A protein has these predicted regions:
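Basic/aromatic-rich interaction segments and small domains that mediate binding to polyanionic partners
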Residues: 2-61
């Protein structure tokens, strides 16, 4: 189950970011299976926030 601050990996290319990009969930949508993900660069610095549906991301353990 996803919740705020869950670490995730993207499964699709979106808004110029490749699949496999790592980030954290910063906001869950109440109206559907989607969330805002803060994407990180290779040094774990935040670079952007992008909306993903739950089937476009997976939890990183």
């Amino acid at each position: 189950m996803l919740e705020d601050y869950t670490k995730v990996k993207t499964l699709v290319e979106k808004d110029g970011f490749p699949s496999g990009t790592i980030g954290i969930v910063v906001s869950l949508y109440e109206n559907g299976p989607a969330c805002e993900v803060e994407l990180w660069d290779s040094d774990s610095n935040p670079i952007d926030v992008v909306t993903y549906t739950f089937d476009e991301i997976e939890v990183v353990l």
